[in-house]
Amino acid sequence: IHAEDLAVGYDRHVVVDDITLDVHPGGLVVLMGTNGSGKSTILRTLAGLLEPVSGDVRVLDEWPGGRAERVAYLPQHPKSLATLPLRASDVVRMGRFARLGLIGRATKEDDEAVETAMARMSVLQFRDKPLHALSGGQQQRVHLAQILARNADVVLLDEPTAGLDAQ
């Protein structure tokens, strides 16, 4: 990720400006700040969900969103899928959709990625449970497993531990 003199916000309203950032492969950056300070806006811009107000930003040498199959983003409050009849394993499998495309068929590699991600997040026991039957913390772990299953080159997590217990 490379950003120089980046300003982010909504429409022309700047929330955070003068952002200069370089994150190299294997790098880790933690954004810290008070509520409403613009952390989520920065992440949404890097994920390609918001246009930058000004400045230059590249993710994997492309404009944000240009390499969507290689970037995984978990918002602070994932959209509730609880109204859909989805099992936890279905939600985790959605992490593979960016690589499969609309008509791609899951392979053994996809199945293994889903199993491995669910095991890493300790949610294998919920595999066949409806998402809506899980607690908020369990749902968050399922969403984190979805991100892991994606095997993305860039992972953007917005408050990923919100609602999780100490284990």
Task: Give each language-model segment a name.
Residues 1, 15-16, 127:
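Conserved structural motif at the start of ABC-family nucleotide-binding domains
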